[in-house]
Amino acid sequence: MVEFTSSPITDLKHPPKSGVTVGILEGAICNTHNIEVAKQMRERCDILIAVGDCATFGGVPAMRNLVGTDVALKRAYIETESTVDGVIPDSLELGKPLDFVVGVDKIVKVDLFVPGCPPRADAFYYALTELLAGRTPVVLPPEVFTYD
């Protein structure tokens, strides 16, 4: 009924180019690499789900929008009290940091959002079982987001 073809546990370097029914993206769009991954996922999937507050709203990484990318990177990699000889990463593999962190839907069309940090298992289960039943929920019911 369900076949997982690509995940961080298997291999993200060579996902299928087509035939993917549901794609699941987590994490905010923080750099140029994230943009490319989101675009590839959108091209290859019939349905794209943004999972977690970071993918849905930008989450904690979007807090850097308040101070700017340069200030945030300098604080994180150079000025922290535990850092000795810090260097801000500069790698093509990591991608160039964006000036503004956003949720996935600011880059590509997202069909379903499952917010939460982390998302509740009930919410994720509801979304996946609805999709397996051939329904794409527009809004997840409030009871799957109730926190005690």
Residue ranges of predicted features:
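Iron-sulfur-associated redox domains of electron-transfer enzymes in respiratory
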Residues: 1-148
